[in-house]
Amino acid sequence: MARPVRVVVLGAGSWGTTVAGLAAHNTPTLLWARNSDTADEINNEHRNSRYLGDRPLPDSMRSTADLVEAAHEADVLVVGVPSHAVRSTLAQIANEVRAWVPVLSLAKGLEPGTRLRPTEVIAECLPGHPVGLLAGPNIAREIVDGLAAASVVATQDVRVATALQPLFASAVFRVYRNTDVLGCELGGVLKNIVAIASGMADGLDVGDNTRAMVLARGLAEMTRLGEAMGANPRTFAGLTGVGDLIATCMSPSSRNRRVGEYIARGMTVDEAVAKLGQVAEGVKTAPTVMELARDYNVEMPIAAEVEAVVAGRQTPEGAYRGLRKVAAGGEHEVA
């Protein structure tokens, strides 16, 4: 009888822990935690109190603080560290991961300086490995609580995606597949910026009509940039596009939405991130996205205002006044 596929997840934040829990219901799973106390808590108490409170984790899920041990065990490697830490983490195990092991990214940001997407960073660090991502409208705590959700495994080789789907699926967690890695990954990156704008709308109490406008026009910006970069525009109408956008902009648990709300209520960006206590990818990503928008000659007025707020050149109130001044042409035109 063939040995079960062993899944290793790097990063014991809320989403990394949740994905490890999903996999642990289907196959042997090991979660690498940077902090040994976190690993001990998962192994002994079957919970990750810092990120998921008292929610129980599968008894079968194991954790380690030894990165090399984790790399040696992987038949499938899932990279759940923040986008700015992907390269430094993988550099430590570049010679430890067996050949041809598929690698999935969970990160939803861009590498500072290089502007590379996480899958591109992974491909540089682990050449020759099939690379993809797992993404969708996934609020970690809801999934751990057993509420229904769906996600997408995106790899260029549909055979790899098909093989990976059942490792994470359950009766209440549907996993679809897609070969548009670029589009799926950009959806996860760009929606964080729109979520900050949505959070600012909440903090300013501008009303549901304005929030709906921000979501709809934000999706248009996401799609325009994605198509200009070579993604399939239809991808942005799916789970990794509009689906992830809605969840991130509407959920009280959304980190990027909360950062936007905190800023609109008078906090500085640093104070908002400190209160959050977790990574809000949109804060780090906004300047890089605007560089891409300029490179590809794509108008992104919402993203531009968010970037200005994050950089301290604009106030949330000024950002919304600026958006009201954007000329309205045909709905499917630029602005």
From Swiss-Prot:
Biological processes annotated in GO: carbohydrate metabolic process; glycerol-3-phosphate biosynthetic process; glycerol-3-phosphate catabolic process; glycerophospholipid metabolic process; phospholipid biosynthetic process
GO cellular component: cytosol
Top-rank lineage group of the source organism: Bacteria
Reactions the enzyme catalyzes: sn-glycerol 3-phosphate + NAD(+) = dihydroxyacetone phosphate + NADH + H(+); sn-glycerol 3-phosphate + NADP(+) = dihydroxyacetone phosphate + NADPH + H(+)
Protein EC: 1.1.1.94
Major location (coarse): cytoplasm
Protein name, entry field: Glycerol-3-phosphate dehydrogenase [NAD(P)+] 1
